[in-house]
């Protein structure tokens, strides 16, 4: 996605450092870091045979030989098989997607909540593409998301030109989403040239055999079905070079690739990001237009991808007079699509709920919205916090509102002041039967106990 800033990435033991401009998608989380370890701590680490190296600049303890969540370049994915995956057993989600209460049985708690408006959260759930444990670590400091009731789909954000472009969600995140009735999908990320992108990666990805099959598409399907997650988000932003340019043929192949995936595995979701157009150009539309609609519907009106995540500039003053969310809704209806298959993107990675948003452009004026809503990097609540208490308070304001109560009417100083996601998204629940059982844990803690004894921090979503 087109980004304004660069954030520093964490690096992990024995993993290549990502190229500095991998900004764009998996910028590292650098909050809540502790002080330098004491001598006593160093002795404990030595006794436990943990290794801390210069590469691990956050001093995060990484256990030797721990299983690792997967990530690949296209050519590596083609070589992957479940039978030869050493960490297969650890990377499989074991929780089926829970059924949610039917939206028609939900009751709005304010006059602007809409049962049809959906929310897609694109979130950095782990701090980097590589080095992620599938199920927890001995640390309490982590992005423990707790507002699943406002999310309809979670994109597990990852990928970098220095580590891998194809990133399935870690199974702990998939399990947590599924418990709450939220589909979780992985990321396919082709970075811009300035961030290390190579057109050869896209060519390998889109290669079609003479029999009409797409080998990488088959592997994406196999990975999702084997690991137990729900689909893929495709972000293609590699521009190519004068010698090897991006072309209309790439756009056509991408459409065919997505249609092939949906034909082979209709149950898997495919989301396309508003980037490459039908002309084979990087031209962010910030709306559903004639230039990018081919990735939602072909010329005969047949469906392609399930949804589209629009770029973020529709809310900027220079484009405000075009009323792009409204125009997108009209274009969707013209194509025979639901306008709620289109997600107006909001980039809050840098400033969170301090980000100015033209909500008046998003609202339809009928206690509804023109499109659905896409939130890029709601993990800001975690990365900007100095401690877990601040994290939870920021997350509450971000997802609910400044009064921490979705039923409260709030008078805003301007149309651009943060409204809170609960302003538009109705609360959804996966609790459809009794008994209801919970341990009241968010998934992290300062103590882990076994036989009533324990002194180790833990994170286990």
Outline where the language-model segments fall.
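Substrate-binding and catalytic surfaces of secreted/luminal carbohydrate-active proteins
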Residues: 269-272, 288-291, 299-461
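N-terminal module-boundary/linker segments of secreted carbohydrate-active enzymes
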Residues: 40-148, 268-269, 278
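Bacterial signal peptide processing site
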Residues: 33-35
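Ser/Thr/Pro-rich, acidic low-complexity intrinsically disordered regulatory segments
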Residues: 50-102, 234, 391-441, 458
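Chitinase-like catalytic core of GlcNAc-active glycosidases
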Residues: 111-327
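Bacterial Sec-dependent N-terminal signal peptides
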Residues: 2-16, 20
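C-terminal motif of bacterial Sec signal peptides marking the signal peptidase cleavage site
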Residues: 28-31
């Amino acid at each position: 996605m087109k980004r304004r800033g660069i954030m520093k990435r964490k690096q992990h033991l024995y993993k290549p450092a990502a190229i500095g401009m991998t900004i764009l998608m998996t910028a590292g989380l650098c909050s809540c870091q502790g002080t330098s370890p004491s001598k006593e701590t160093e002795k404990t680490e030595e006794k436990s045979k943990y290794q801390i190296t210069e590469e691990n600049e956050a001093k995060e303890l990484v256990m030797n030989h721990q299983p690792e969540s997967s990530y690949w370049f296209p050519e590596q994915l083609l070589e992957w098989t479940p039978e030869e995956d050493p960490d297969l057993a650890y990377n499989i989600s074991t929780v089926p997607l829970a059924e949610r209460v039917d939206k028609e049985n939900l009751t709005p708690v304010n006059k602007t909540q809409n049962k049809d408006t959906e929310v897609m959260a694109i979130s950095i759930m782990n701090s980097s593409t590589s080095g992620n444990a599938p199920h927890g670590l001995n640390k309490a400091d982590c992005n423990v998301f707790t507002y699943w009731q406002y999310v309809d789909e979670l994109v597990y954000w990852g990928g970098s030109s220095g580590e891998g472009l194809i990133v399935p969600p870690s199974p702990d995140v998939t399990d947590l989403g599924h418990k709450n009735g939220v589909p979780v999908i992985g990321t396919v990320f082709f970075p811009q040239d300035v961030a290390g992108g190579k057109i050869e990666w896209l060519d390998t990805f889109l290669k079609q055999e003479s029999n009409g099959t797409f080998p990488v598409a088959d592997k994406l399907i196999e990975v999702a079905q084997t690991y137990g997650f729900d689909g893929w988000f495709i972000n293609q932003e590699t521009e190519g070079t004068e010698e090897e340019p991006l072309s209309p043929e790439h756009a056509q192949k991408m459409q065919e690739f997505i249609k092939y995936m949906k034909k082979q595995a209709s149950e898997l979701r495919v989301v396309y990001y508003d980037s490459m157009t039908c002309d084979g150009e990087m031209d962010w539309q910030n709306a559903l237009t004639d230039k990018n609609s081919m990735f939602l519907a072909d010329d005969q009106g047949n469906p392609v991808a399930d949804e589209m995540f629009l770029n973020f500039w529709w809310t900027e003053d220079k484009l405000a007079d075009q009323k792009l969310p409204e125009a997108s809704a009209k274009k969707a209806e013209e194509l025979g699509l639901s306008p709620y298959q289109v997600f107006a993107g909001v980039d809050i990675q840098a400033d969170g709920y301090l980000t100015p948003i033209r909500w008046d452009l998003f609202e339809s004026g009928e206690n509804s919205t023109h499109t659905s809503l896409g939130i890029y990097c709601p993990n800001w609540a975690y990365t900007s916090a100095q401690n877990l208490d601040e994290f939870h308070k920021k997350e509450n304001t971000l997802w609910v509102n400044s009064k921490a109560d979705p039923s409260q009417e709030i008078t805003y100083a301007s149309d651009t002041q943060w409204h809170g996601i609960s302003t538009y998204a109705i609360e959804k629940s996966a609790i459809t039967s009794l008994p209801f059982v919970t341990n009241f844990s968010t998934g992290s803690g300062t103590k882990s106990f076994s036989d009533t004894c324990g002194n180790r921090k833990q994170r286990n979503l």
